[in-house]
C-alpha cells in the first residue's frame, strides 16, 4: 500500500493508476507509430497487411478510449487523497503541468472518438472491430466530406498528443536530472 503524507494524501499514485498510466503510454505510442506506418504503406501492399494495421489500430484506439474513461473515474473517486503537485515547483511549472495533464487526458478521449467517427462516416468503411466483442455499431451517416473532417481532426490531434507526451516526459526527466531529484522529482510517484 502506498504511504500517506502528513496531510493525508498519498505519496505515490495507487498501483492501479500507475499501471493504467504506463499501459496507456505504451498503447498511445504504439498507435501513433501504427498510424504513421499504415498511412504510409505503398499502394501495392497486400490487403492482409492493410487489414492487420487498420483493424488493430481501430480496436486498440477503442481500448485507449476505454482506459482513459476508467482512469478518469478512478481519479475522481480518489481525488482527495492523490498526490498534490510538489510545492517546490515554480508557478509556471505548476500551471504547465496541469495544462499538459488535462490536455493529454482530453486528447486520449477525443482522438479515438475522431477515429471512430472517421470509420463510421466513411462510405467504404469495413467497420470498427473491438477484440472479442465483434464490430461496434457505426452510428454516423455515411458521408465522405464528414470523413475528411474527422480524418484531419484525428491526425492533427494525434500530432498534438505526441508533442504533449514528449513535453510530459521531458518535464519528468528535467525534474529527475536537472533539478537533481528532491521534492520536485515526480517520477517515483508513477513507478
Where are these predicted regions, by residue range?
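Membrane-embedded alpha-helical bundles that constitute the cytochrome b-like, heme-associated redox core
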Residues: 1-191
